[in-house]
């Protein structure tokens, strides 16, 4: 929690941003599902592109997993494609003050990335929204 999410105000001013939410207690998957279900689309996520602090894997290997991970998965796992244990732990991990999840139209990607770079943010896409399919969220 080094900085506030004030950049969200700038993101919201871009016409290419179609949805945005902070990633908190329902974790990345829960908030992504809210966007998908509210917009009647699905998402395909490249798990290897989801940012994660390096030391988190050590904690997972030690079995230090928040109880909220399982509760989150129980509440929305039926709408998610198959996940291994590590994917489930990372993608269902409840956050107190997570980052922003932003949906950007493909034609606006350059403008979005320029705004990010101008604000010292090095962001990359983690997936894409697609015509609604089942499951609502799937991983590559």
Each language-model region and where it sits:
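Active-site glycine-rich loop that binds ribose-phosphate moieties when present
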Residues: 1-12
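Glycine-/charge-enriched secondary-structure boundary and capping motifs
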Residues: 13-140
């Amino acid at each position: 929690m080094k900085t506030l999410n004030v950049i969200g105000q700038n993101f919201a001013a871009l016409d290419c941003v179609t949805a945005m939410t902070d990633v908190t207690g329902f974790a990345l998957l829960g908030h992504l599902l809210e966007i998908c279900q509210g917009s009647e689309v699905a998402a395909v996520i490249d798990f290897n592109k989801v940012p994660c602090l390096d030391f988190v894997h050590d904690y997972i290997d030690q079995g230090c997993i928040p109880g909220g991970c399982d509760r989150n998965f129980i509440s929305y796992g039926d709408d998610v494609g198959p996940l291994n244990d590590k994917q489930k732990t990372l993608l269902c991990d409840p956050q107190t003050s997570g980052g922003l999840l932003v949906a950007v139209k493909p034609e606006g990607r350059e403008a979005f990335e320029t705004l990010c770079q101008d604000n010292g943010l090095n962001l990359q896409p983690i997936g894409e929204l697609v015509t609604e399919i089942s499951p609502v969220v799937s991983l590559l």
